[in-house]
């Protein structure tokens, strides 16, 4: 994982950043729109770069 831990967001933070619900965030993941990093405990983490890339691609 090359991203700095300071640039990683939790699922809740990522959903808020994207202005979607947690359910919608999960749907985006299921269809391959986002592939989050996983912590050793299995928690999802999203980089700001990943989220911005998704936003830019979804606007096209």
Regions picked out by a protein language model, each given a short descriptive name:
Residues 49-60:
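A short, Lys/Arg-enriched interface patch at domain edges and termini
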Residues 1-27:
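Polyanion-binding surface elements
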Residues 12, 48-49:
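Structural detector for helix-capping/boundary residues
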């Amino acid at each position: 994982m090359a991203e700095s831990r300071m640039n990683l967001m939790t699922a809740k933070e990522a959903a808020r950043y994207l202005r979607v619900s947690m359910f919608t965030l999960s749907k985006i993941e299921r269809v391959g729109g986002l592939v989050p990093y996983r912590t050793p405990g299995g928690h999802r983490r999203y980089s700001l770069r990943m989220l911005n890339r998704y936003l830019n691609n979804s606007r096209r």
